[in-house]
């Protein structure tokens, strides 16, 4: 597995992201809070991480939910995956939502999401009058599962 140089800046005292196992695809992001807060069922909040990154051109970072929080507490990300573009230099924030039935306390330093790095290509759009035919055609949602 190769490595990607990513410049990172701590905006507050917060743990640096780390891979938790040898072959983990993502690093954990932690909440960087001055005080814990409660996320009520159905409520969402932007949770700061205290981190900013500089990605090389041609890469993005994807912010994804943690499966354990989803399974045990119904905690998810509203926009999953969230995209961090290579030219973004602000603080990484995570939009959490409580889809569970119980209030959930978000604590400072708690692992709230994971971040995965990926190459990305820029599309060059070529406007045409017709698109090529396929067996699927315009079959949409649920089409391949019938």
Curated annotation (Swiss-Prot):
It catalyses: dUTP + H2O = dUMP + diphosphate + H(+). GO terms for biological process: dUMP biosynthetic process; dUTP catabolic process. Keywords: Hydrolase, Magnesium, Metal-binding, Nucleotide metabolism. GO terms for molecular function: dUTP diphosphatase activity; magnesium ion binding. Coiled coil: none annotated. Transmembrane segments: none annotated. Pathway: Pyrimidine metabolism; dUMP biosynthesis; dUMP from dCTP (dUTP route): step 2/2. Substrate binds at residues 66-68, 79, 83-85. Its EC number is 3.6.1.23. Pfam families: dUTPase. SUPFAM superfamilies: dUTPase-like. Its cofactor is Mg(2+). HAMAP family: dUTPase_bact. This enzyme is involved in nucleotide metabolism: it produces dUMP, the immediate precursor of thymidine nucleotides and it decreases the intracellular concentration of dUTP so that uracil cannot be incorporated into DNA. Belongs to the dUTPase family. This is Deoxyuridine 5'-triphosphate nucleotidohydrolase. It comes from Citrifermentans bemidjiense (strain ATCC BAA-1014 / DSM 16622 / JCM 12645 / Bem) (Geobacter bemidjiensis).
């Amino acid at each position: 597995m190769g490595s990607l140089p990513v410049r990172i800046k701590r905006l507050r005292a917060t743990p640096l992201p780390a891979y938790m196992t040898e072959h983990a695809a993502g690093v954990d992001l932690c909440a960087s809070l001055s005080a814990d807060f409660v996320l009520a069922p159905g409520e969402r909040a932007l949770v700061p991480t205290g981190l900013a990154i500089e990605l090389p051109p041609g890469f993005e970072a994807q912010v994804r939910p943690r499966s354990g929080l989803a399974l045990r507490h119904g905690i998810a990300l509203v926009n999953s995956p969230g995209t961090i573009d290579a030219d973004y230099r602000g603080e990484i924030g995570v939009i959490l939502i409580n889809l569970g039935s119980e209030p959930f306390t978000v604590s400072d330093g708690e692992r709230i999401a994971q971040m995965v790095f990926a190459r990305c290509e820029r599309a060059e759009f070529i406007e045409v009058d017709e698109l090529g035919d396929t067996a699927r055609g315009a079959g949409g949602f649920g089409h391949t599962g019938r």
